[in-house]
Amino acid sequence: MSRKHLTARQQEIFDFLKHHIDTTGMPPTRVEIAREIGFKSPNAAEEHLKALARKGYIEMLSGTSRGIRILINNDNEDVTQDLSLPLIGKVAAGTPIMAIEHVESHYPVNGAMFNPNADYLLKVNGNSMEKIGILDGDLLAVHKTNFARNGQVVVARVEDEVTVKRLEKKGELIYLHPENDELQPIIVDPRLKYIEIEGIAVGVIRNNAWM
């Protein structure tokens, strides 16, 4: 597919989008784009995003948290493909997330919605991550991995329980931070308590977009 060339500023924003997704697992907000690029207003970021969408480099999604989808990879190749991802409901204590009894159904998505790729969708229970737009009933797209960087939103298993939180490693301790001012972080000493990273969040599908 032939695409129009980007201006220097559009290329800068496009590169930031890809870098932010690679490092955090999610697209940036308009405010984050404006702060990074030096715009005075998020509206300026919005206009450049619309230009990127018109030129075929991204798609702006409704019903999706941080609704930006990259349409080409670093080699300027199309990455769109249809997938059917398992939808995971409530995870029983001490059992693998992908156990067959947890799969409620399969949900069709376009593979380009998520970078890195999503391996499954996890139904969100509660509002512990509401400040970053992950709400009760949403579907959290998860990339399976045991490695995560500080600041990424992870699916973590602490003892027998699975939780979605923002990761911070500090010294010997691991902090799992909620994005809700009414809740406290989970603090884990891996020497005393079992903890494993089971995946990183790579996107969100709003509950009213699939229910």
From Swiss-Prot:
Q: Which residues form the active site?
A: 128, 165
Any single biological process term in GO: proteolysis
Keywords assigned by UniProt?
Autocatalytic cleavage, DNA damage, DNA repair, DNA replication, DNA-binding, Hydrolase, Repressor, SOS response, Transcription, Transcription regulation
GO molecular-function term, one example from the UniProt record: serine-type endopeptidase activity
Q: What is its EC number?
A: 3.4.21.88
Q: Which residues bind DNA?
A: 30-50
Reactions catalysed: Hydrolysis of Ala-|-Gly bond in repressor LexA
Site residues by UniProt (Cleavage): 93-94
Q: InterPro entries annotated for this entry?
A: LexA (IPR006200), LexA-like (IPR039418), LexA/Signal_pep-like_sf (IPR036286), LexA_DNA-bd_dom (IPR006199), LexA_repressor (IPR050077), Peptidase_S24_LexA (IPR006197), Peptidase_S24_S26A/B/C (IPR015927), WH-like_DNA-bd_sf (IPR036388)
Q: What does this protein do?
A: Represses a number of genes involved in the response to DNA damage (SOS response), including recA and lexA. In the presence of single-stranded DNA, RecA interacts with LexA causing an autocatalytic cleavage which disrupts the DNA-binding part of LexA, leading to derepression of the SOS regulon and eventually DNA repair.
Record's subunit section? Homodimer.
Give the record's family classification: Belongs to the peptidase S24 family.
Q: What is this protein called?
A: LexA repressor
